């Protein structure tokens, strides 16, 4: 019987560098783009595979039938074309520089249930070590929680960016969870100065994540 791949095996394949190290830049670019374009233009880039809704001010159900996943987006969010094939959902809200993303990494085989917690924790610990080397990143925290019915490893941090004369501090929450042979990364990004106004609804959104 083939053995499952260890968290350190994941590191050897550089999955962290491929699927995580660039996600902060994707978040920043999406947030900046939607601020510049405005909600109307962002809504115009909604993927055709996702059902249209009557108004961006209403909550809407997003789903990906290919992966068999869904969640309810908060009011005010507009869907935009994911910038990379690994990202299946990219939703933005211009006020507060908010972004919600879901990306997926296929595994060779499912991780046994009894080993999933250790697998997730060690995966985030490896990424945490990378983040700690960046002086622009602060307030790094990791832990375990649940997203819907799924056990998940959590990682939060704040990163500073300099855009000309403008300083932007982006707050990020990432959740790593397993479902079948897929590893999902759920990401929330918000302007650090106003994040408390939005985090509650964004976290509630992630709790609606489900598989079918």
Which role does the model predict for each range below?
Residues 12-26:
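Bacterial N-terminal signal peptides that target proteins for export
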Residues 1-16:
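N-terminal amphipathic/basic-hydrophobic helices that include classical n-h-c signal peptides
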Residues 24-35:
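Bacterial N-terminal signal peptides
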Residues 49-86:
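N-terminal "mature-domain start" segment
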